[in-house]
């Protein structure tokens, strides 16, 4: 499903984020990316939906070289990818339901179908009863679950998450981790950058150290 072939990523003036990364992620896998702060975890994830482009090497998603895609082709790549990053970018002046509806509205989904999908996504993460609440009224764990619901509302086959349990207490972190595990169990390919691999028992671990697989 995903193949990294001799990937390097450098930032000016002379910062190496990733160096000579070659690995493959199979469809349906649950993979955790482990490493200290600055190890390159976030950068590696951002290469997959072409948020970042590699300095060298090739990233293939379903056989497609994402680094060569033009701006017009990116929406077609990203519609099959769910993204959950540390900066959730929730709209705090809109309800939980409205936040989840937004990706479907942007892509022109019929309203009734969009409403049904958004409510189903909220239900999957245990937030349907809070559908009318503003994000400011939600706890940190609930806000993270809301971000997950928004990421999966378009039913992607690949789910990427960057430290989704950061700043959460132990019990809440495990609750959030379990949501990703459940999506993996129904066939979604899941990649999670995490500081605590114990939250994802049974996951294949990809360890990064100073931008290299260790």
Model-flagged regions — what are they?
Residues 49:
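Helix-to-loop junction immediately C-terminal to a conserved catalytic motif
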Residues 57-65:
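Conserved ABC transporter NBD signature motif
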Residues 153-157:
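A short, proline-enriched helix->beta-strand linker immediately N-terminal to the Walker B motif
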Residues 159-162:
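Catalytic Walker B motif of ABC-type/P-loop ATPase nucleotide-binding domains
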């Amino acid at each position: 499903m995903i193949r990294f072939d001799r990937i390097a990523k450098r930032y000016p003036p002379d910062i190496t984020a990733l160096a000579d990364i070659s690995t493959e992620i199979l469809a349906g896998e649950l993979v955790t990316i482990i490493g200290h702060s600055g190890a390159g975890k976030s950068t590696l994830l951002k290469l997959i939906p072409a948020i970042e482009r590699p300095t060298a090497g090739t990233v293939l998603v379903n056989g497609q070289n994402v680094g060569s895609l033009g701006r017009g082709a990116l929406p077609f790549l990203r519609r099959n990818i769910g993204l959950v990053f540390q900066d959730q970018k929730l709209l705090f002046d809109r309800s939980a339901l409205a936040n989840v509806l937004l990706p479907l509205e942007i892509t022109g989904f019929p309203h009734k179908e969009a409403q049904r999908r958004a409510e189903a996504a909220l239900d999957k993460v245990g937030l349907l009863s809070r559908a009318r609440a503003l994000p400011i009224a939600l706890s940190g764990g609930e806000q993270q679950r809301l971000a997950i619901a928004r990421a999966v509302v378009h039913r992607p086959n690949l789910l990427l998450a960057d430290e989704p349990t950061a700043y959460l207490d132990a019990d809440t972190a495990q609750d959030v981790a379990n949501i990703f595990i459940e999506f993996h169990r129904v066939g979604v390919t899941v990649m999670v950058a995490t500081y605590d691999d114990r939250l994802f028992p049974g996951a294949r671990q990809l360890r990064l150290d100073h931008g290299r697989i260790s």
